[in-house]
Amino acid sequence: EIKGACAFAVSIYNIAIRGCFRTQESHRYFDEYMDADRLTDEERAGVLVVFGAFDSNVLCGVCGMTNEGHITMLYVHPQYLRRGIGKKLLERVRIYARMQLKIMQVSVNAMPAYTADYFRRVGFKSAYQGGFCNGQDDMYVPMTAKSIYQVEYTPRHIADKTFIAISVGFTCLVFFSGLIYAVCAGLTP
């Protein structure tokens, strides 16, 4: 499972991100980090958990979290961008941080730095002013967000006619259920 997630992340990195970095050191750092055997060992040791998003058994996104609440490996296939998959994966790891790890705040390094705008839109804040270099010329932005108990969805307005129809239907159901109970119990209405 981890090996599949690693292969997926590497392919997305090569397709969409590798060209964003200017130095070979950045590529080497990524390649070393994504060593499938090392990450498998981390998962077995409880240091890392990785979640996947699937579309009809096709892996379309991954996101990992360390046991310290650091989000890593958020990758969504370009064909699945702007469908809420990254947001759902982030929600899932934030819930995991709160419920399983008992961590109140999670962190992520937005890298490449331009991805910080995306993380801001989904509730993260910059941990420091500006960005930092990761030892090379390429920038990243450390960010944090609160972990969450559950996904909070914006309630939708229910049209008045729909609400009335549901209310009338429920009232009829209760009335007739009571009537049937009374008849079955031998009571006269």
Region spans (language model):
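A short beta-loop-alpha structural element at the N-terminal edge
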Residues: 1-10, 14, 18
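Conserved GNAT-fold acetyl-CoA-binding loop/helix
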Residues: 13-39
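A short helix-loop-beta-strand connector motif used in the catalytic cores of GNAT acetyltransferases and
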Residues: 34-51, 70
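Conserved beta-hairpin
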Residues: 47-61, 66
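Conserved acetyl-CoA pyrophosphate-binding loop and the N-cap/start of the following alpha-helix
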Residues: 53, 80, 84-92
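Conserved acetyl-CoA binding element of GNAT-fold acetyltransferases
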Residues: 66-79
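Conserved active-site alpha-helix within GNAT-family acetyltransferase domains
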Residues: 87, 110-129, 133-136
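Conserved GNAT acetyl-CoA-binding A-motif
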Residues: 97-111
